[in-house]
Amino acid sequence: MEKESQTIFEKNVIEFVTVAAEFCAFLERAESMKRSTFVDTSLKILPLLYLKASMLPKCETIGDEAPETYVTEEIYEILRINLAGLMGDKDDYLDVFVQDMVYSDQPIKKSISEDLSDIYQDIKDFIFVFQLGLNETMNDSLAICQENFGMLWGQKLVNTLRALHDVKYNLQDNEEEEENNEEGFYEPSEDDSCCEEGGCHCHDDECHRSEERRVGKESR
């Protein structure tokens, strides 16, 4: 037990805790971000979270009771709704790496907001117990988080990463398209040349040539 309880103080565990805490804080303040910023940051922090989780030392539960949890249904729903609002029409994506594919030959529709909320729930519960500072529950919380990484949220993280990658580059394509549309739109400016005849600024000399021909005919 002494050896197992010391696992929580290993370097790889501390690094995972640091990244996990930052991941939770990032999602909690996501509502105030632009979608492009959120997507770009997610594509950086999610691979790091996966890497640190995959480097955790083997850990097994030593207590008789399950550790406390932090994320309630209300907390989960608030986060999911905020993320769904942020992602908008880019929230849904098609996935084949889900258990439901056993019963279907078609991709299953998933959502980035729900996947991230699921990951958040596991990570936040772990961080909450870790911050309590009790060795036994810290150890057991780590063991549960590690098990869920292999069985649940690790796969969701990878799937979400793929979807976010697609969103990022679709956003860039949309921005380039908008820029091209703006470049193709002509609006005369004060710097454009104009006839300036008689104080006129019509940008059309032909109107004055027509007027000159009309006046000439009348004089004859």
List where the protein language model places each region:
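Short, charged, low-complexity loops and linkers
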Residues: 1-6, 26-35, 99-109
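N-terminal interaction modules that seed assembly of large macromolecular complexes
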Residues: 2, 14-73
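Generic structural concept
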Residues: 17, 43-50, 80, 113, ...
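Conserved small/polar residues in nucleotide/adenosyl-binding loops
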Residues: 212-219
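Amphipathic protein-protein interaction modules
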Residues: 88-154
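Alpha-helical oligomerization segments
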Residues: 136-208
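Charged/polar positions within long, soluble alpha-helices
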Residues: 25-28, 51-61, 88-95, 124-135, ...
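Long, low-complexity or tandemly repetitive, helically biased scaffold regions used
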Residues: 51-105
